[in-house]
Structures are given as C-alpha cells and as structure tokens.
Design a protein with these regions (language model features):
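TPR/TPR-like (Sel1-like) alpha-helical repeat modules
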Residues: 364, 412-439, 462-465
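Canonical positions in the second alpha-helix
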Residues: 56, 89-90, 123-124, 157-158, ...
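Structural marker of alpha-solenoid helical repeat scaffolds
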Residues: 59, 92-94, 127-128, 161, ...
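Canonical tetratricopeptide repeat
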Residues: 69, 103, 137, 171, ...
Length: 467
C-alpha cells in the first residue's frame, strides 16, 4: 500500500530509489514523478525512467505530462507508430499542449521529414509561453536541412533567452563558420562579450575567428582574455600556442602546450605541436623525443607518423623515413596520405617500381590531389613507361581539366613518344591555359624547348593571345 514519506520534498530521486530497494510503495506527486523521469532521461538511465513512468501512471493515470514522457521514451526507442497512436489519444484530451506538437515533430525528424518537423515546431511556438527549448529544436532541424541561416537565427534566440546557454552559442558560431561569415561571427561575439566580459567560451571562440582570418595579434589577445577568465581552460592555452607558432614565438608556444599537459592527461596533439616547435628551433633531439611520444600516445594518429617520416625525409635520411612510413602502413594500410608519402620516399631512393605501386594505392584510396597525378606520371616515365605516364595524366585531367601543369607534362611525354599531332594539341591547350607556365615545360623537357617546332607553336599562340 502507498505510504507517506518523511523524506524532504526536494529529495524525490533518493526517495524513489529507496523505494525500489524495498517492497514498500511511496506516494509521489505527479510533478515529482516528472522531475524523477527527467533526471533519468538526462542522465541516459532509460530503464529507470521507464520504471518511474510505469509507477507514476499507476498513481496518476490521468496525467497528460507523464503520458507525454512515455511518448518521449517510445520515440527515443524508435517505437514511432505506437508513439503516434498515443499522441492521437492525448490530442483529443488536450489539443493545446505544445509538447504534443513537439513529440510529433520529433517523430517526423526521426523519419527524416524535417520540413514537417519544422511546421509542427512552429505550431508549438504559438502555444508555448516558454519557447526556449522549441527554438533549440528548430535550430537542429534547420541544421539537418542545411539551412544554416535559419539555424543561426534560432540558436541566437536561445542565447538571447539564456546567455549561459553555451551549447547554443557554439551552434551560432558553427553556423557563422559554415556560412564563411567570419566577420559576422566576430561582430556577434564582441557584442556578446560587451554583456559578458568574463565568458571564457566567447573569448575562445573569438580567438578562433581571428585565427581563421590570420589576425594573429587579435587572436592572441582573445585567448589571453579566455585564460584570464578561466586559467584552467585548456583549449585556450592550446589555441594560444598555435597563434604563437604562427608568430614564430616557438618557445612561448611550447610553454602553452606544456601547460595543457600539466593540467590534464597528455594528448598526442600537444606532443606533436611541441615536437614541431622544437624542429623549428632546430632542437632535433627534442623534436624526435616529442614525435615519438606522439605516436606512443596515439598510434593511430596519422599526423604523428607523418611528422616522424617528414623529419627524416627533410634531412634526406630516406631509409629511416621509409622505415617509419612502413610502420604507419602496417597500422593503417588504408590511409592514402601514408601511401603518397611512401611514393615520395621511394622516388627519392630511386625505387621506382615501389613508388609506382604506392602512387597507385594512394589514388585507389581516394587521393586525387594534383601533385599525386603529376608525381605518379613522372615515376611511370622513370620506369620507361611513357604511354602509362600519358594515361595517368589523362586520368588526372578528368579531375583538373584546367590544369596547365598536366597539359605541359602531357605534351612533353607525347613528344617523347613521337606523337606529334597530340603533342601539338596538348601544348597549345597548355599555353592557352597559362602561358606563363611554359617554364615548367622548359625545365622538364629542355631538349624540345629550342626546337623550331615548339618555337612556332609558342609564337602563334602568343600572337593570338595578344589580339
């Protein structure tokens, strides 16, 4: 039987959990059940939320709010048809309850019908006295629809309602960034900081906008203010370090990265950036020390392995570079950047068969960058496969139809094959695309640049371009 409880009314969760451990049944107000259920839902304890809903409806079978929480759980668990049937019944009981429209919107959102979800949320707005949560949901629906302008406006309303709603603040800035309106973001954040001068989150975001615009002194000031507002804000120290790197102040950058390590468990990203700073300072042993720590901390961080490989590659220690890129490939053989670097190293070692294989792997895994096509063609040429080199360049041309580099290189290889007709077409196309890059052709194919055949083509195209 239900018992009265001497528990304080502000302790319904403790009281409920105590009840679950015994055979007693305590009575709760419907509002208490709502608080208990919200607590469990917010903490991801769905099973306990469902228990609270079941007991709550046994004690308050007419409570629309408890039934709506049951619908919320059904939607979360993707029992959408059952949830819709419940909502149909509830709407006959209370047709002006905005939560009914919100849950219907959630169902449509789950079905990827975001336009219908928006329409229902706008209906809920007309019924609600407190529209804060609805604007947040609208913002998310607009994000799903890639309508970043309307999403930004919705999240701005949330921030205007509660300036401590940092989740919405982040979303506002995300929308500005996606719209590439960095000036708009800077203006918005400065306006926000006029009202909240000690908000470390806003200072941090402002610094990132300045960094994007390469306004490094302003970015540095913003991150300093973020640290003044919260001297344990790790993100501000890390971003400040990146700014100091850009300004060439590598020792100061190291101090900021080390601060993040001292405040929290070390991260591979911090080790990596410290290593790069030491390399810039020509502290080679320290650079290696931190690069090795980077891959020890996170063996799957591709930037770490590439940093060690590049370290040796820049010093022309190609065998060591090859050793480390092969270790990286053993960890992640599906990484196109690893294969591209492997190709560069094998080319430097004049192992052109291996380089050809590595370039092919990189392309097959989705690396379609222009230098990859050009490098692969050069390797094919070194392997005496001129026809293969031309074929590679024609593939690359599909991705870069306006690339003069591809055209000049194609013309040179076609001349090597004595394919004069296609060589003429390729060279004319290259000159029309970028006459100024004729030097690329001259440097790679000096044996042809001074021939009458090439001079005549160059002269004719030059005259046509002047007209």
């Amino acid at each position: 039987m239900a018992q009265a409880s001497n528990e304080k009314p502000n302790q319904p969760i403790d009281k409920f959990e105590s009840m679950l451990k015994t055979d007693d049944v305590y009575f709760f107000d419907a509002e208490d059940f709502e608080d208990i259920i919200h607590h469990y839902l917010n903490n991801g304890k769905i099973a306990l939320a469902k228990k609270a809903i079941k007991i709550g409806l046994q004690q308050h079978p007419a409570s629309v709010e408890l039934k709506l929480l049951e619908v919320e759980v059904l939607v979360f668990e993707n029992h959408l048809d059952i949830a819709e049937n419940y909502l149909d019944v509830l709407q006959t009981l209370d047709s002006t309850n905005e939560e009914i429209f919100i849950q219907r919107a959630n169902i449509f959102s789950k079905k990827d019908n975001h336009e219908a979800a928006v329409a229902l949320l706008n209906e809920a707005l007309g019924l609600s006295e407190n529209s804060f949560d609805i604007h947040s949901l609208l913002g998310m629906e607009y994000l799903f629809m890639d309508d970043f302008k309307l999403a930004k406006e919705s999240f701005m309303r949330c921030v205007a309602f509660d300036e401590q709603d940092y989740s919405s603040l982040y979303n506002v800035i995300y929308c500005f960034e996606f719209l590439e309106d960095f000036d708009g973001a800077i203006h918005y954040l400065n306006d926000y900081l006029e009202r909240n001068p000690y908000c470390e989150v806003a200072w941090h975001q402002l610094g990132k906008q300045y960094f994007t615009k390469k306004m490094y002194p302003e970015a540095l000031t913003a991150f300093d203010f973020a640290i003044i507002s919260d001297d344990t804000f790790i993100g501000a120290y890390f971003e400040k370090g990146k700014v100091l790197e850009k300004l060439g102040k590598y020792n100061e950058a190291i101090e900021n990265y080390e601060a993040t390590i001292q405040m929290e468990d070390p991260t591979s990203h911090a080790y990596l950036r410290i290593g790069r700073c030491h390399e810039q300072l020509e502290n080679d042993e320290m650079a290696k020390y931190y690069y090795y720590h980077t891959v020890h901390e996170d063996p799957l961080l591709d930037k770490g392995w590439l940093a060690i490989t590049d370290f040796y590659f820049r010093r022309k220690e190609y065998e060591k570079a090859l050793y480390y890129i092969n270790k990286a490939l053993n960890i992640d053989g599906e990484n196109p950047q690893y294969w591209k670097k492997c190709a560069h190293i094998n080319s430097a070692l004049e192992k052109f068969d291996q380089a050809d294989f590595a370039y092919k792997q990189s392309i097959d895994l989705g690396n379609y960058e222009l230098p990859t096509w050009l490098g692969w063609a050069d390797v094919a040429c070194q392997n005496q496969d001129i026809a293969g080199a031309v074929h590679i360049l024609l593939q690359g041309q599909e991705f870069y139809p306006e690339s003069a580099e591809i055209k000049y290189k194609t013309a040179g290889f076609q001349l090597e094959m004595n394919d004069m007709i296609n060589a003429r077409i390729s060279l004319i196309d290259a000159l029309k695309l970028d006459f100024g890059k004729l030097e690329l052709f001259s440097s790679q194919f000096p044996q042809y640049i001074d021939t009458d055949w090439v001079r005549n083509i160059v002269s004719k195209v030059e005259r046509s371009l002047r007209q």
